[in-house]
UniProtKB/Swiss-Prot annotation:
Keywords: Carbohydrate metabolism, Glycosyltransferase, Transferase. It holds the Pfam family Raffinose_syn. GO terms for molecular function: galactinol-sucrose galactosyltransferase activity. The keyword DNA damage does not apply. InterPro entries: Aldolase_TIM, Glycoside_hydrolase_SF, Glycosyl_hydrolases_36. It catalyses: alpha-D-galactosyl-(1->3)-1D-myo-inositol + sucrose = raffinose + myo-inositol. Transglycosidase operating by a ping-pong reaction mechanism. Involved in the synthesis of raffinose, a major soluble carbohydrate in seeds, roots and tubers. Gene3D superfamilies: Aldolase class I. Its EC number is 2.4.1.82. This is Probable galactinol--sucrose galactosyltransferase 1. Belongs to the glycosyl hydrolases 36 family.
């Protein structure tokens, strides 16, 4: 029987839009049609079973000889990508799966184009579902509650399946369908984005780690400001809180890491962030509090936003039970129990320490009071938001609380209620939070760290960092704006990281040590007023990269696309040679010399480019390459070759070409010295007056502006009604002129070309 959008189980085959996706489907597998207007493009898969248990596994059928890409948790905290063609290649803890159902799976023998089938394992009651494969190529549902006493499940709505010819649309519609079904989270498009995303920032972590002091924060901000690149937000990371160990706890010692045995001992700051503070002695004097630090750094450094770090449980080891002044949170030591799927993937020193020492878990019924006390204090001293870390630890603590899903919902509801009350700009960054317990419980949180950390001293981690964020974003970007993490501007891979963030649509912030900056690089990202040219969407892989492996196959480049108001941008990266090793459970360089890779960029790599063209567009475009400085006219359905050596990148600005009635053609590139050149164009209008054309633009920033004009030198270029000198290259059609440094923040230049 056919249900949903052409989805059926026929003769033990799961058939989607005429394509066989799974075969050997067991008789206990259910396919339930979705209901409601938003759900017409999909159906739910579930199982019937008389089995009970807090951890159950069921087969859905065999997946064979079809290309897929999935994102799965390779650590308790984080996801990464995996590509393959058979079910046995699907790892445990897979939370998103997309399968290419091509001609070979067409049961009717007809010549059909590919369809894309998305599988989203979701929450049902107190259980969470994930996908995994087995050696028989079966795609399995793993169902888990996280509490041995929670063992009864319904089983009818465990996985949502959607299909269509446009992979990006299918993914978005699938998540929106689950949103309507669950009613427990909101899609990214319906969330308020905090303004800090639009400005350059600095984070204390890789500069000082937990040793950070108030003096260090001032020094870091002043060092960047002195170079002419002024941060507008700062994240004071781990190291500001009042923490301590139990007498019986075992200290965790590792380079550049926190002591995970520590617990929170006070809501307020430690002595390092008090005026004239002394170790081991904190005072409750408002005039000496964290507020004096915030006031100082905001007033002296033109800061707009200050965020501070805390764990979702207060600190890594939770809140210390019975400590004076915090008894009313009713913290009790609990011992984490990780799921088998996570345990099979990594050896985590953090989890090992917390498991050994336990975690002081605030009573879920008191956790809003805890968050509100913490956040209201922070807001009162001038803090604008928080980076809430260690979130996935909650899934290990569900026993005795009705299970992992119920505990996560209580904590996230309380957290978001406190954020709404205390930080009106929705000031929260979600971190170490790549599980669906949290994603499907987030109604308001709008920013999420999208991959494992930037590891400055691990050469194997950099290329996989870029690839992981891009592929994770296919899933995470439907829930929140992905955050690509901090990076160092002075580093062998600094340009590589910077270029990726320029196309990511994300916040841009560094963790440089004072005095260790590459200001020339930062000026390609940051305007003089501290704002950035942030693209409109989460940066995602182009559709032709979905099923190729840019990390391991020795032949594929990674292309990441995004949109500006009137242009597109594509970042191309050679990521080959290193990745996460599932055997050694660490990042590993598997090829010291992965070689040069060739590929191409096309106009339609920018998936929704037609939506931002300010006219009826024929499909021709101008492509400007940032590193090579070349301007190329690219006719519709043609491509531009690109060749990159290992760890190299290139950024292309892609601009729809406007053809006027006199045959002349025009396309604005933007600020040519910036990575995301086209992000500077805020408005664009074409007036076609037959014998002449007029182009009116509003631009942000300063520096060299480039536009394409095909057949003649422009008659004039004016900026704010003043004629300006310009240069015209008839061979390429490139017109360039310079914008000065505006006196006002976010100033818009009025540019007219005719």
């Amino acid at each position: 029987m056919t249900v949903g959008a052409g989805i059926s189980v026929t003769d033990s085959d799961l058939v989607v839009l005429g394509h066989r996706v799974l075969h050997g489907v067991p008789e206990n597998v259910l396919v339930t049609p979705a209901s409601g207007n938003a759900l017409i493009d999909g159906a739910f898969i579930g199982v019937t079973s008389d089995q009970t248990g807090s951890h159950r596994v069921f087969s859905l059928g065999k997946l064979e000889d079809l290309r897929f890409m999935c994102v799965f948790r390779f650590k308790l905290w984080w996801m990464t990508q995996r590509m393959g063609t058979n079910g046995k290649e699907i790892p445990c803890e897979t939370q998103f799966l997309i399968v290419e159902a091509n001609q070979g799976s067409d049961l009717g023998g007809r010549d059909q184009s590919s369809s894309y089938v998305v599988f989203l394992p979701i929450l049902e009651g107190d259980f969470r579902a994930v996908l995994q494969g087995n050696e028989a190529n079966e795609l399995e549902i793993c169902l888990e509650s996280g509490d041995p006493t929670v063992d009864q499940f319904e089983g009818s709505h465990l996985v949502f399946v959607a299909a269509g010819s446009d992979p990006f649309d299918v993914i978005t519609k699938a998540v929106k369908a689950v949103e309507q079904h669950l009613q427990t989270f909101s899609h990214r498009e319906r969330k308020k984005m905090p303004d800090m995303l639009n400005w350059f920032g600095w984070c204390t972590w890789d500069a000082f780690y937990t040793n950070v002091t108030a003096k260090d924060v001032k020094q870091g901000l002043e060092s960047l400001k002195a170079g002419g690149v002024t941060p507008k937000f700062v994240i004071i990371d781990d190291g500001w809180q009042s923490v301590g160990m139990d007498e019986t706890s075992v200290e965790f010692n590792a380079d550049n890491a926190a002591n995970f045995a520590n617990r929170l001992t006070h809501i307020k700051e430690n002595h390092k962030f008090q005026k004239d503070g002394k170790e081991g002695h904190r005072v409750d004097d408002p005039s000496l509090s964290l507020g004096h630090v915030i006031t100082d750094i905001k007033s002296n450094n033109s800061l707009k936003y200050v965020y501070v770090w805390h764990a979702i449980t207060g600190y890594w080891g939770g809140v210390k039970p019975g400590v004076s002044g915090m008894e009313h949170y009713e913290s009790k030591v609990a011992y984490p129990v990780s799921s088998p799927g996570v345990m099979s993937s990594e050896n985590c020193g953090c989890l090992e320490s917390i498991t050994k020492n336990g975690l002081g878990l605030v009573n879920p019924e008191k956790v809003f009071s805890f968050y509100n006390d913490l956040h209201s204090y922070l807001a009162s001293v001038g803090v604008d938001g928080v980076k809430v870390d260690v979130q996935n630890i909650l899934e290990t603590l569900g026993a005795g609380h009705g299970g992992r899903v119920k505990l996560a919902k209580k904590y996230h509801q309380a957290l978001e209620a406190s954020i709404s009350r205390n930080f009106p700009d929705n000031g929260i960054i979600s971190c170490m939070s790549h599980n669906t317990d949290g994603l499907y419980s987030a109604k308001k949180t709008a920013v999420i760290r999208a991959s494992d950390d930037f590891w400055p001293r691990d050469p194997a981690s950099h290329t996989i960092h870029i690839a992981s964020v891009a592929y994770n974003t296919l899933f995470l970007g439907e829930f929140m704006q992905p955050d690509w993490d901090m990076f160092h501007s002075l580093h062998p891979m600094a340009e590589y990281h910077a270029a990726a963030r320029a196309v990511g649509g994300c916040a841009i912030y560094v963790s440089d040590k004072p005095g260790q900056h590459d200001f020339n690089l930062l000026r390609k990202l940051v305007l003089r007023d501290g704002s950035i040219l942030r693209a409109k969407l989460p940066g995602r892989p182009t559709s032709d990269c979905f099923f190729s492996d840019p990390v391991r196959d020795n032949k594929s480049l990674l292309k990441i696309w995004n949109l500006n108001e009137f242009t597109g941008v594509i970042g191309v990266f050679n990521c080959q040679g290193a990745g996460w090793c599932k055997n050694e459970k660490r990042y590993l360089i598997h090829d010291q010399e992965p070689g040069t890779i060739s590929g191409c960029v096309r106009t339609n790599d920018v998936h929704y480019l037609h939506k931002v063209a300010a006219f009826e567009w024929t499909g021709d475009s101008i492509v400007y390459s940032h590193l090579r400085g070349e301007l190329v006219y690219l006719p519709k359905d043609t491509s531009l070759p690109v060749t990159l050596m290992p760890r190299e990148y290139e950024v292309f600005t892609v601009v729809p070409v406007k053809e006027f009635s006199d045959g002349s053609k025009f396309a604005p590139v933007g600020l040519m010295e910036m990575f995301n050149s086209g992000g500077a164009i805020v408005s664009l209008r074409y007036d076609d007056e037959g014998t002449k054309f007029v182009v009116r633009m509003k631009l942000r920033g300063s520096g060299l502006v480039g536009v394409y004009s095909s057949v003649r030198r422009p008659r004039s270029v004016t900026v704010d009604s003043d004629d300006v000198e310009y240069r015209y290259e008839p061979e390429s059609g490139l017109v360039t002129f310079t914008l000065g440094v505006p006196e006002k923040e976010l100033y818009l230049w009025d540019v007219v070309i005719q």
